[in-house]
């Protein structure tokens, strides 16, 4: 009520009245904003007894903080999904991994394959048995002649033939050269992924020398198509065995230099010891083979357990690991290179004279000298390379100890000159399937070390 009395005083009740002749000049129109608006009596009486009742919105209203900044809501933290590859330099080809990361820790690793799929197994069905051979060079394109060896032995089983002893010794010789080629690539690129560049450049110089042996014996540095059903394509050139002997003497020093760089290196051990551990039970359950199986402590080598060609006539040891980690697998590969040198020296010492192809005109082409003088030999050669030879009906599974593991060929013949079905068992496929188990709980940088120790090549995985 005191406010109402003040309003009456302000609005004229009991206030002096200004007249025109009083000497005070009144403005004709007050300027805008000159006086502050004051509520009149009626307005004050109208709202004097108003009461604000709370509504649903106003009941929960809280005044904003003093600096008028909204409080941040807590958000549920989710794992990050990261695409690794296929263009990553450490992916070893066209590997694509979808990684689920919790910070730097790997929670899930999902490999995506098929980016190098060429339909090789189907293409083989449209080729003769000899024309299908070069496809095997392109599967594991780091260990070429070992793939040819598996296919050739499978065809020879179906044909029920056996190559001459000299051809078998040549196969073993170049199979072990191929094993060293593969292990050089595996060990040095693994080191390169982790950060050691020097072994890569040192050992690739030695690799070029072995490519020269390939070239001298077949004309090609990589995709040789040299080991064929019935033997090998041609005999060794003069002086090749002497050069291989000189190489094998000096190569052991190169292995020692690489071991000096890596084996006791503190950084290398920190990046490989207790990384990617695989127990013997897990290795068997996943179907691992080769170094991945032997690194876990299982002494299984098809050259010992199921000898082929002349592996039962050579002496060598099978190195195994004890912990099943990346470091053990590295040591196994280094020791396997030394054992391959032992086998190469035995092949050089025991190389017998004689033929290099089976003495069966239905399988082996005639010699070049005969083709220059005999029309029948020329026709025979032409028909053999265009139509091929008929293989009796049957099926066989043939496996060899390739550098990466058990490389198997399941071959089905229907009696024609073309395979009815050819199924290829690649060792790297099972190893890649175990990548999720091996990398779970490790850091993102350790995934690169695990991929390197698996020695993955996508030519054989995608096929």
Swiss-Prot record:
Keyword Protein biosynthesis: no
EC number in record: 7.1.1.2
Modified residues (N6-acetyllysine): 62
GO MF, one annotated term: ubiquitin protein ligase binding
CC annotations in GO: mitochondrial inner membrane; mitochondrion; respiratory chain complex I
Residues that bind [4Fe-4S] cluster: 326, 332, 347
Signal peptide positions (record): none
Protein's UniProt name: NADH dehydrogenase [ubiquinone] iron-sulfur protein 2, mitochondrial
Gene behind this protein: Ndufs2
């Amino acid at each position: 009520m005191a406010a109402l009395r003040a309003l009456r005083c302000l609005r004229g009740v009991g206030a002096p009245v200004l007249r025109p002749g009083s000497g005070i000049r009144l403005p004709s129109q007050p300027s805008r904003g000159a006086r502050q608006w004051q509520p009149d009596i009626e307005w004050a009486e109208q709202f004097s007894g108003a009461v604000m009742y709370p509504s649903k919105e106003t009941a929960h209203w809280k005044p904003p903080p003093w600096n008028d900044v909204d409080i941040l809501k807590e958000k549920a933290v989710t794992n990050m999904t990261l695409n690794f590859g296929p263009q990553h330099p450490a992916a070893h080809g066209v590997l694509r991994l979808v990684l689920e990361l919790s910070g730097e820790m790997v929670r899930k690793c999902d490999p995506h394959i098929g980016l190098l799929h060429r339909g090789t197994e189907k293409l083989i069905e449209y080729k003769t048995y000899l024309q299908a051979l070069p496809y095997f060079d392109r599967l594991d394109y780091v260990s070429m002649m070992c793939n040819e060896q598996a296919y050739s032995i499978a065809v020879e089983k179906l044909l029920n033939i056996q190559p001459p002893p000299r051809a078998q010794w040549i196969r073993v010789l170049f199979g072990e050269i191929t094993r060293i080629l593969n292990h050089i690539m595996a060990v040095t690129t693994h080191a390169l992924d982790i950060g050691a560049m020097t072994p890569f450049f040192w050992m690739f110089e030695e690799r070029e020398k072995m490519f020269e042996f390939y070239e001298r014996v077949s004309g090609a540095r990589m995709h040789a198509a040299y080991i064929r059903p019935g033997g090998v394509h041609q005999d060794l050139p003069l002086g090749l065995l002497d050069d291989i002997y000189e190489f094998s003497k000096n190569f052991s020093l190169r292995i020692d230099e690489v071991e000096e760089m890596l084996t006791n290196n503190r950084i290398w051990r920190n990046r490989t010891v207790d990384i990617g551990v695989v127990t013997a039970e897990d290795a068997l359950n996943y179907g691992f083979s080769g170094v991945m199986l032997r690194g876990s402590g299982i002494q299984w080598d098809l050259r010992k357990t199921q000898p082929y060609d002349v592996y039962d006539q050579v002496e060598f040891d099978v190195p195994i690991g004890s912990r099943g980690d990346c470091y053990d697998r590295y040591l196994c590969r280094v020791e396997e290179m030394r054992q391959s040198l032992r086998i190469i020296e035995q092949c050089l010492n025991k190389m017998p004279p004689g033929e290099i192809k089976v003495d069966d005109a239905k399988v082996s082409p005639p010699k070049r000298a005969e083709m220059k003088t005999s029309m029948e030999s020329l026709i025979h050669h032409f028909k053999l390379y265009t139509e091929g030879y008929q293989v009796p009906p049957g099926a066989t599974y043939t496996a060899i100890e390739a550098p990466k593991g058990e490389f198997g060929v399941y071959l089905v013949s229907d009696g024609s000159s073309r395979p009815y079905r050819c199924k290829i068992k690649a060792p790297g496929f099972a190893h890649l399937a175990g990548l999720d188990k091996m990398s779970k709980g490790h850091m993102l940088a350790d995934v690169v070390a695990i991929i390197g120790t698996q020695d993955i090549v996508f030519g054989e995985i995608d096929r």
